[in-house]
């Protein structure tokens, strides 16, 4: 499929709950649509997901299109989560994918197994689930993903992990953060939105290992110095009472968390860096 045709399909899908992007009957080795397509826009996601919808909203969720396919007794459920932008799709993917086990030849970031395939492409997070669990169905998950890759244009992504040098990063530990739910996977800094990300600013995190030891580093880029400075001030004022500030610094502070480990908040220009999980005080 040509890029122009893929873009036309994407435009058409935007007005139809993304139905135009779904693989047709007979795709992936003979699977056919089994039930009416379901579309859950906005807050209706709560009617589709039994827990865990909030992280989608934090990153920026628009709608999910759900289609079930059958081939004899085999069944596959395909979910197309349209997010607000490519980084939103990547953020949810990184938080859910675990250790990636890619299939050969699939030109999109993904992880594939016997029971499920998860893929990020453009503004979409795609989840294909093998409902019967038969090993013979696993290739169909990859086949449907190939079909979707041809229909959904790729989108360029900024290198949000550039500040976390590759030679220091622990592979597979990369995550994105746009609010307190994603941040809470690493540390509870305070109530509300401690880093003032507001679902719009995308912070990057990863485990880093160097002379300081192994720790988690979070880098948040703000629109300007004033916004970053205000975020540090707000964070310091609303810091979780279980966190002890050990030393105030010109543009941040050093702390000990509730587990007895150490961390640092530091601002440099319009960027805030948070280090957590240090064995020794910096």
Each predicted region: which residue ranges?
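Soluble, non-membrane globular domain cores that form compact, hydrophobic packing
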Residues: 2-77, 81-282
